[in-house]
Amino acid sequence: MSEEFLKQLFETEVPEVFEGLVEIKKIVRVPGYKSKLAVISNDPNIDPVGTCVGVGGVRIKPILKELGTEKIDIIAWNSSQEDFVKDSLKPADINRVEISDDEKSAKVWLDEDQRSLAIGKMGQNISLASRLTGLNVELVAIETKEDLDQKLSNEF
């Protein structure tokens, strides 16, 4: 099942995608595990993510059923690379993103307890986020005050 197949499923289940009111900018997949879609609407009155999910998930549920165990993350396309990288790494909570001068990589700061969420099962979440954004994503874990206090107390 390709990215094109997933796009056709969305065109079937989401009239706004079929009509072009919501555009799927990019799809990246690991079939059977997870897909990430970046969506945008040129109409400020249309929430592209909410439109694709539907009230109570009514639009996304038939797509998920068709895909079996595969999960789908729908992300709003964002012209701010920093925000787009942040959103693409969900469900992880990101503190800060810095895009390299050559715009080929992103350094992402997050709390240590968010690291495994950002990486995902077998590295799939960070891999899909990198493919979706077109950037090499590097995670930088920030130790919390409690972590530092614990290290200090263990040293004495």
In which residue ranges do the predicted regions lie?
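RNA-contacting regions in translation and RNA-metabolism proteins
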Residues: 1-156
